[in-house]
């Protein structure tokens, strides 16, 4: 059966294409219609020749293993790390996706909630956080709806059309919750859900305070594309009582701490990266943290330089490559700073003339919006600390001048 790559810009059309192809045992590559030229080139080099592309014009150039497509008929290839130019597709199949859905179902059942999961999705379906609410509903006999997640101040909040029975789940990031709470009806709107899964970047204090003060049914979740979205959550009552944010693993999930790095054993873990390495068990997340005696995990940040901006993972090295290629930059260091709206925002510290700022901003238009620096710091030399490493505090002070 011929494979398909889906790039529709309309979310409902996108989901229909993915679900129809998957039900017909067609391998499905999920593409981001907003990818820039670099991301599309990277994706085309991975998607096998002969794959039918829907939604955009793209010519697949990728190679495929000898058992393609027969050995991959129930697979979904979900993108990760696309922001910044280099795309990877995580391989999931029906078994891993079902394990993720049923793991959440069982964890919520243990808390007295219905095993029928209705999902309201507010992120694009090419993100695992936008896809999984739909699959959870399918695996548990629930219903789902996809809604505009921008929550613009001049628009009314979307009407959620889900059945009364069952567990109504919203999947949101903290930026969205902040915008919803600014709306006069925001608090009432949020409380229509039994469960609000809060993912993405570290949660700012004002959002935590709002969750606590209004007793919102927020489950601070931890997970990634590789684990088919969340693999643990911190339940609302822990947040309300001002306890540390700890992720309690879903059934079948185990966290392992190795040299302060977090590894995950999970039945929902993907098979590997397409045309790349298989995932080891346990899977190394790249996150720093601590595993407590009760098995819960506390995440302390990334062990690499990845920036998480509005739920998008941004690779600073790719941005640096694009800016260096202009020939206008003698030295550069891209990093993330805390941002109340986005979690983190991208900042470029550059040894360059400020007169070239317009040209630099033009150069990064080949990247997704999330990967384009929101601020530029023009310096004579990159600030370094006594160890010869990038001095983040010095750079942040320059940013405030």
Predicted ranges, named:
Residues 368-390:
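AMP-binding/adenylate-forming catalytic domain of the ANL superfamily
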Residues 74-89, 108:
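Conserved adenylation A10 loop of the ANL superfamily
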């Amino acid at each position: 059966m011929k494979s398909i790559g889906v790039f529709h810009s309309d979310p409902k059309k996108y989901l229909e294409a993915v679900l129809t192809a998957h039900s017909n045992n067609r391998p499905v590559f999920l593409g981001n219609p907003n990818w820039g030229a670099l991301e599309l080139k990277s994706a085309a080099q991975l998607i096998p020749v002969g794959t039918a592309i829907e939604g955009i014009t793209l010519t697949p150039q990728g190679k495929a293993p000898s058992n393609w497509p027969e050995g991959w008929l129930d697979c979904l290839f979900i993108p990760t790390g696309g922001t910044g130019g280099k795309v990877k597709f995580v391989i999931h199949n029906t078994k891993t996706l079902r394990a993720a859905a049923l793991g959440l179902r069982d964890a919520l059942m243990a808390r007295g909630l219905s095993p029928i999961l209705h999902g309201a999705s507010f992120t694009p379906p090419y993100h695992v956080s936008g896809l999984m609410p739909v699959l959870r509903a399918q695996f548990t006999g629930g219903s789902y709806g996809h809604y505009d997640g921008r929550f613009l101040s001049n628009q009314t909040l979307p009407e959620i059309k889900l059945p009364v029975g069952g567990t109504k789940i919203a999947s949101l990031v903290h930026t969205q919750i902040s915008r919803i709470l600014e709306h006069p009806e925001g608090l009432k709107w949020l409380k229509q859900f039994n469960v609000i899964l809060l993912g993405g970047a570290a949660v700012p204090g004002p959002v935590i305070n709002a969750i606590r003060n209004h007793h919102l049914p927020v489950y601070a979740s931890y997970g990634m594309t590789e684990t088919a979205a969340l693999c643990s959550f911190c339940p609302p009552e822990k947040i309300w009582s001002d306890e540390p944010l700890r992720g309690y693993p879903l059934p079948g999930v185990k966290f392992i701490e190795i040299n302060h790095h977090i590894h995950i054993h999970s039945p929902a873990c993907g098979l590997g990266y397409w045309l790349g390495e298989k995932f080891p068990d346990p899977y190394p997340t790249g996150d720093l943290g601590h595993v407590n005696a009760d098995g819960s995990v506390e995440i302390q940040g990334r062990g690499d330089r990845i920036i998480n901006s509005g739920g998008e993972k941004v690779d600073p090295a790719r941005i640096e490559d694009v800016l260096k290629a202009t020939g206008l930059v003698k030295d550069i260091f891209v990093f993330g700073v805390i941002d109340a709206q986005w979690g983190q925002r991208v900042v470029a510290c550059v040894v360059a003339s400020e007169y070239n700022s317009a040209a630099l901003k033009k150069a990064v238009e080949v990247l997704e919006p999330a990967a384009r620096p929101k601020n530029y710091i023009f310096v004579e030399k990159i600030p370094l600390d006594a160890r010869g490493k990038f001095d983040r505090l010095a750079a942040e002070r320059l940013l405030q001048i």
